[in-house]
């Protein structure tokens, strides 16, 4: 397996007392077409993340182009192989099984919820999946999404729905996902960035063989309580997206 690490550091500071440090990853798996689940799990596990947001996650499907993944439960296998808890959110029935998004968490979860996102053009359904997790003495909401690929207007509606839903949380929130939008699009520039802490940089994440565009992100709220320590786009060929992993700190309430 070829791995090269492109590390960019955006902030370095002494850790205040009571600060919580988290390592979080987002990874679009391309429904396991380019790698085995064991390879993907080993790749994830190597970074020892606290949370992983996963997109294009199959369960019991039988795709013609992925015979090596037939009838496999992606999230359960990845959870077992990484030693993490796994949560799954189906978005569509597909090829004898389901297709959707998932979460891996090193920390126990209290509850979870799936919210279907606006779909005005009646295209592929999209969802927000989130879980409330206990991290030591702290409580964190961790979320994943995968926005519409066709319409910037639909993506903006979906991002607005996500923001409004998660802004209700009494706890700090981290969301990762494939937003299918470059940083300049209103989905990111006018909806996410003004209201969320950006826990990545603008390094391109897709496609793996010649990265040209950034569409994979990690965001946190409330903005004032988060500090980014490192962020990296990992060069690998196990999917058509490059995984993004960031280490961030949740600062104490002032």
Spans of features found by a protein language model:
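Acidic/histidine-rich, surface-exposed loop or edge segments in extracytoplasmic proteins
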Residues: 24-26, 53-62
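Short, flexible/disordered intra-domain loops and linkers
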Residues: 59-72
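Charged, glycine-enriched surface loops/patches
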Residues: 74-84, 104
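Active-site regions of metal-assisted phosphoester/phosphodiester hydrolases
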Residues: 11-51, 85-88, 92-254
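Bacterial N-terminal signal peptides
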Residues: 1-6
């Amino acid at each position: 397996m070829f791995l090269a690490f492109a590390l960019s550091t955006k902030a370095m500071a002494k850790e205040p007392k009571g600060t919580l440090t988290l390592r979080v990853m987002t990874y679009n798996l391309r429904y396991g077409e380019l790698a085995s689940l064991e390879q993907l799990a080993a790749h994830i596990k190597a970074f020892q993340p606290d949370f992983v947001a996963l997109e294009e996650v199959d369960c019991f499907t039988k795709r013609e182009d992925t015979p090596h993944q037939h009838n496999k439960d992606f999230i359960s296998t990845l959870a077992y192989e990484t030693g993490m808890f796994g949560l799954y959110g189906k978005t569509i029935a597909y090829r004898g099984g389901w297709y959707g998004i998932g979460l891996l968490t090193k920390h126990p979860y209290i509850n979870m919820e799936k919210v279907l996102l606006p779909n005005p053009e009646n295209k592929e359904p999209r969802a927000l999946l989130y879980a409330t997790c206990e991290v030591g003495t702290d409580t964190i909401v961790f979320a994943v999404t995968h926005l519409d690929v066709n319409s910037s207007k639909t993506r903006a509606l979906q991002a607005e729905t996500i923001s409004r839903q998660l802004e209700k949380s009494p706890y700090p929130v981290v969301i990762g996902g494939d937003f299918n939008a470059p940083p300049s699009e209103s989905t990111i520039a006018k909806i996410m960035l003004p209201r969320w802490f950006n826990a990545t940089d603008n390094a391109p994440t897709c496609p793996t063989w010649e990265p040209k565009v950034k569409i994979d992100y990690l965001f946190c709220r409330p903005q004032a309580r988060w500090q980014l320590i490192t962020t990296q786009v990992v060069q690998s060929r196990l999917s058509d997206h490059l995984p993004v992993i960031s280490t961030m700190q949740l600062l104490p309430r002032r």
